[in-house]
Amino acid sequence: MIRYGILLMGLCQERFLEVFSGNMPNSDIRHIRLVFIRSTHCVALHLKGVNLSMTEKQKDDIYYVCCLMEFIARKTKNHRQDVVRHFTKKDLERQLRLAEVNHCLSFEQVSDELIEDYKIQDGMFDTVNECRYEVPSVTSIGMLYQELVLAIMPEEDAAQGIIDIFSSFITDEISDFNSNVYYTNPDYLRCSYLEGKMLA
């Protein structure tokens, strides 16, 4: 994997996969995608429309809340849309304000409190146990959601952006960890979201 990683920073994702996909097993490509989406700089270069006027703290707060939504969904085995429906816009604005403090706590502790407070029941959408490959981390998927929120949110309205993305069909597509959706080009996901369907 080292020789792949060395070239990662010098190639855009499409060119990278074009060069190596014919010579790499799927598990390696998935790993490369996880490395790729952990680099905020690389992803931001891909994603047209990313809001560059926000402070790093504001972006970090969005990232934290996106990770938290993903964690709660996995823990309760729910669709991401079903989780976000429990939160009003004011609720999410509060979570964004608390993000700087809550990130010092474990996701487990914070999620337990929210699951109890908002009465989030267990579902049957178990994307982790159904995954036949290495499960992408909560933080990797959270970063992907963060970039989508930054790309589509109206007038720096982060709470509304989170609601819009997590209420969308795109979350079920990303949550299918047996597919290649979660490690495809982030701008492709943005365009698919705006189109209301996965583009061919």
Question: Which residues does each predicted region cover?
Answer:
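Short, Lys/Arg-enriched N-terminal segments with co-localized hydrophobic residues
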Residues: 34-53
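N-terminal interaction modules that seed assembly of large macromolecular complexes
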Residues: 54, 62, 67-116
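A structured, charge-rich N-terminal accessory region that forms the first stable segment of a protein
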Residues: 59, 132-153, 164-174
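Long, compositionally biased
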Residues: 101-137, 141
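Glycine-rich, aromatic-bearing surface loops/beta-hairpins
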Residues: 166-200
